[in-house]
Amino acid sequence: MNTPYYLIDEAALRRNLEILRGVRERTGCKILLAQKAFSMFAVYPIIAEYLDGATASGLFEARLAAEELQGENHVFSAAYRAEDIPELARLCDHVVFNSCAQLRAYAPQVLAAGKQAGLRINPECSTQEGHAIYDPCGEKSRLGVTRAQFDPEVLPLLSGLHFHTLCEQDSDALETTLDAVEARFGEFFPGLRWLNFGGGHHITRPGYDIPRLERC
């Protein structure tokens, strides 16, 4: 065998995936693989047995998911290049934008391809400690649209809203965040098809409060 190589414990991987599948089955939610965190496509066939699809942070990850992982394909990027939109609209089921301006500019192409457009929001609710520089809800963050920046006129273009504010955290942080999301954006929920809770949920960690997650 050629070295170096990556060695995956399939039994451990499946144990974690079983935990996630249990959450899916008990709640009806969808769980996606965040390729930014794990993109070893050799095990994508195993992951596809348990999860609903994958998320991408740009065109190349979107291609990888389309080629190697059966299921839904979602993409979010802080900004898109105009020339990438046609391929993203072909490859992805959901294309999530970071600003109302990019949504207005590119969502019509996504909708014309029969796909769904979303918008990342900033609930302005920080639950992280020790690494404020990475906090999407931190001061001067450009990740997501605040309520003050949100323009209700874009609602006809939207299928859903997306937030990503956690980092390897427990479900109490999600509960706090959801309260803030509902307080700031709840008035728009009735017209939406979905709400994406983003990543950073350490669900497979020993001691994670899964019942609380499922109540959320």
Place the predicted regions along the sequence by residue:
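A non-catalytic, amphipathic alpha-helix used as a structural packing/dimerization or gating element
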Residues: A11-I19, A180
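Acidic, glycine-rich loop-and-beta core segments that form the ion-binding/anion-interacting portion
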Residues: L178-C216
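Generic N-terminal amphipathic, Lys/Arg-enriched alpha-helix
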Residues: M1-L7
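A short, N-terminal amphipathic alpha-helix
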Residues: N16-E25, L64
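Active-site-proximal beta-alpha core segment in soluble small-molecule metabolic enzymes
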Residues: C29-W194
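Soluble or luminal CAZymes and related metallo-dependent hydrolases
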Residues: A12, N98, R212
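A short small-residue
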Residues: M1, S159-H164, G198-H201
